[in-house]
A protein has these predicted regions:
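An acidic/histidine-cluster motif and surrounding catalytic segment
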Residues: 1-97, 102-313
C-alpha cells in the first residue's frame, strides 16, 4: 500500500540535473504531488529544465501531480524560498522542503513524513529535519521515537513544517523583538552567554538585511515561540553543494564533520546494540549546522587533525 506523503516542495536554481535526481528519488518513494519553484532568468538554463521535465510522466510515473513555477525574474535564494513556501501553504497544510543540493533517500522521505504526521499537533512543534552532523552508515533509522529527538536548533537540509507554524514566520525581525527574547523566551534564557552573543549577532544582521538569510529568521521564530525541531539521531540527508562550483553559499565551506557519500547510506541492517549505544552518546549533542554552540565540534576537529598529523609521522 502506498504511503500518503505530504506535499513536496523542491527549490531549484541553475542545476536541472540535481533536481532531476531528486525527482527520481521521489518517484521511487511513490510520492504523488510535487511542486518545483525555479529561480532563474537564463533562457538556456530554462530550456535545459524543460528538456529534463518534458517527458516527466514517462520518467516519473508515480508522480501524478507535478507542477513547475519558472520565476519570470531572478528573485534570489531568500525570496524564492520564502515565496514558494508561502504560495504552497495557501493550498496545503503540511510541506516537506528540499533545496536542489540536498541529498536524500526514499527512507528519508518515509521517516520525515512519519514524524511530521505524528508530532505536528504537539504544542512545541516547530519543524522536522532530516539532518544531523553525525553519520553512521550501519545505524538503522526508523520513525520510532527512540531514534529521533527534540532540539532547539533548525538544520534546513531537508525539512518540513505546517501552515500553522509558518503563519508565525516573518523575514523581518525588529530590534525590539530581539530584545524581548530575554523576557519572553524560556529557550533563549536557557542558552549560555556565548550562545546568546552569537545568535544575537546573527539576528541583528538579519534585521539590517532581511534578504541575507531566511533560515536565521526561522531559528528566531523557534526561540521566540519556544518551539522544537524533531531530528534524527544520525543524519538522513546531506549537501552536495560543498563539492559543486555552482553552489554560491556552500562551495568550499564544508565543516569537518560533514560526511561524504551521504546519498549512499544503507541502514537496512537492524543493529540494535549500536543504536542503543549511539543514542546514549549522541542524545546530548545538538545538531545544527549554523548553531552558536559548536565549540565541542571545533575542539573535536582540532583534536582529529592533531591525531592525523601524529599518525602520519
Amino acid at each position: 500500500m502506498d504511503l500518503k506523503f505530504s506535499q513536496i516542495l523542491l527549490i531549484g536554481y541553475r542545476r536541472p540535473d540535481l533536481t532531476f535526481e531528486q525527482l527520481q528519488v521521489l518517484n521511487l518513494a511513490r510520492t504523488k504531488s510535487v511542486h518545483i519553484a525555479i529561480d532563474l532568468s537564463d533562457k538556456v538554463i530554462k530550456q535545459k529544465f524543460e528538456a529534463y521535465l518534458l517527458n516527466y510522466q514517462n520518467n516519473f510515473p508515480n508522480i501524478t501531480n507535478l507542477t513547475v513555477d519558472f520565476r519570470n525574474i531572478k528573485m534570489g535564494m531568500v525570496q524564492n524560498i520564502h515565496s514558494a513556501i508561502c504560495e504552497q501553504f495557501q493550498m496545503h497544510e503540511k510541506l516537506l522542503i528540499f533545496e536542489d543540493d540536498i541529498l536524500f533517500t526514499e527512507q528519508t522521505l518515509i521517516n520525515l513524513n512519519a514524524i511530521l504526521d505524528h508530532y505536528e499537533k504537539a504544542k512545541d512543534f516547530g519543524a522536522v529535519s532530516a539532518f544531523s552532523p553525525l553519520s553512521a552508515k550501519l545505524l538503522p533509522m526508523s520513525s520510532n521515537s527512540k531514534t529521533w529527538r527534540k532540539s532547539i536548533y533548525f538544520p534546513c537540509w531537508g525539512w518540513g513544517t505546517t501552515r500553522q507554524v509558518w503563519q508565525k514566520y516573518n523575514l523581518r525581525i525588529s530590534k525590539q523583538e530581539i530584545l524581548d527574547l530575554e523576557d519572553t523566551s524560556k529557550t533563549w534564557n536557557n542558552l549560555n552567554n556565548h550562545q546568546k552573543k552569537v545568535w544575537r549577532g546573527r539576528f541583528y544582521k538579519s534585521h539590517k538585511n532581511p534578504e541575507r538569510t531566511w533560515d536565521t529568521q526561522f531559528q528566531f521564530l523557534l526561540f521566540k515561540r519556544d518551539l522544537k525541531v524533531y531530528l534524527p539521531m544520525i543524519t538522513y540527508s546531506g549537501n552536495i553543494g560543498f563539492n559543486d562550483a555552482n553552489a554560491v553559499n556552500t562551495f568550499g565551506k564544508k565543516p569537518f564533520w560533514v560526511q561524504e557519500n551521504v546519498s549512499n547510506l544503507d541502514r537496512r541492517n537492524n543493529i540494535k546494540f549500536v543504536r542503543k549505544i549511539m543514542f546514549r552518546v549522541f542524545m546530548f549533542i545538538d545538531s545544527n549546522t549554523f548553531a552558536g554552540d559548536t565549540r565541542v565540534f571545533k575542539f573535536y576537529g582540532k583534536f582529529k587533525i592533531l591525531i592525523n598529523k601524529l599518525s602520519n609521522k
